[in-house]
Amino acid sequence: MVDDYVELGQLTALRFLEWVSLNPGGVIALPTGKTPEFFIKWVQFYLTNWKKELNNGILAKIGLDKKLLPDMKSLHFFQLDEFFPIRPEHERSFTYFVKNFYIDGFGFDPKKVHLINTFDIPEKARKDFGKIQHLDEVFPDGVIDLGLRVQKPNNERDLLKQKTIKLFDQFCQDYEDDIQQRGGLGFFLGGIGPDGHIAFNVKGSAHHSHTRLTNINYETQAAAATDLGGIELVRKKAVITIGLDTIVYNPDAVAIIIAAGQSKSEQVYNAVEKDPDITYPATSLQKLKHARFFITHSATTLLTLSEENIRQLVKEKKLPSNYFEK
C-alpha cells in the first residue's frame, strides 16, 4: 500500500525484477495500456542503473542478492489480450504496445514473445483462404457476430466468416496449450477494469475460463472507446483474452493486481472481501497463495479493515508478516 501511482509503479517494478532475478527463463504476462505506465518507467530505470542501485540504492536496501541479475532475454512472454480484429501496427493495438515497450523497452527476446495477432490469417491456414490474407477482407464492415459459430451460414460471406472464427478458436486453444505446457504463468501482472475485469475477463466470466475469442460488455467497450475511435466502432469488435483459469493454472504463480485511486476502491473491495463469484472476476485469484493487490491508500476506502488494524493484526501474528509486500 503506497501513496500514489508513481510509488505503485516503483513497488511493482521491484517485485517484478526480484522475481525475474530468481526465475530465469520464467513465463510471464504483463499488462498494456495506461495501467503499467510507471511500472515500465521504473523497470527501465533499474535495468539501466542495476549495478549502482544494487550497491548503494534501493536494491541494496531491500537486500537483493548482489549476485543476481534479471535476464530479460530468457523470459517467455505471453500477451494478455487483444481486440479482434485490429492491425498489429495500429498505435492503440496491444501488440504494438508489447513490441514498443516490452520487446524494445525491456529487451525481451522476440522469439520468446507470444503475440496475439488478430489481423493476419495465420500462415499455416492461408492455403484454405485463397487470396485473402487479412481479417478486414473477411469482415469488411467490422462487425463480428460470434453467433456464426453455431448458426447455419446464409451465404458464402457468412461461411467465410464462420471458417475464420473457428480458425481463431483453434488459435486460442493452441495458445492456451502453449502456456500450460510451460507449466503456466509464473508471474502475472494486471490492472482491474471499471467493471472489475481482469484482462478481458469481464464480470460473469467463468473462473475456469481459458484463452478464447469472446465479446465484451458495455463498460469495457466504453473504457476503450476513446482510444479506438468511439463506442460504435468498439461495439462491433470482439476480443481474444487469456482466461481466469489461465492465470491461476500454476498454483505457485505470483499474481499482482495494481489499482490506484478512489475510483478503484469498489473493485478492490469486491475482489478482496467478496467470496469467489463470477460477478467479480478478480475473486478467482483468491486460490493463489502468492496473489496480491498492490494499491494506493485512496483505493482502500471501502475495505472493512483499516491499514492500522491490518498492521496490528500482522504485529499480533494473526496475519502473515508479508501481508504488505514492500
Q: Which stretches of residues belong to each language-model region?
A:
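Ligand-binding beta-strand-loop-alpha-helix segment within the catalytic cores
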Residues: 57-186, 313-325
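Glycine-rich beta-strand-to-loop/alpha-helix junction loops that act as flexible
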Residues: 30-35, 190-194, 260
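Catalytic cores of processing enzymes, dominated by hydrolases/peptidases
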Residues: 218-249, 258
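Active-site histidine-anchored catalytic micro-motif
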Residues: 40-41, 45-90, 123, 161, ...
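Short, conserved loop/helix-junction motifs that constitute active-site signature segments
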Residues: 50, 67-74, 106-108, 247-252, ...
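Gly/Ser/Thr-rich active-site loops/lids in small-molecule metabolic enzymes
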Residues: 200-233, 275-287
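N-terminal glycine-/serine-/threonine-rich phosphate-binding loop
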Residues: 1-29, 38-69, 132, 137-138
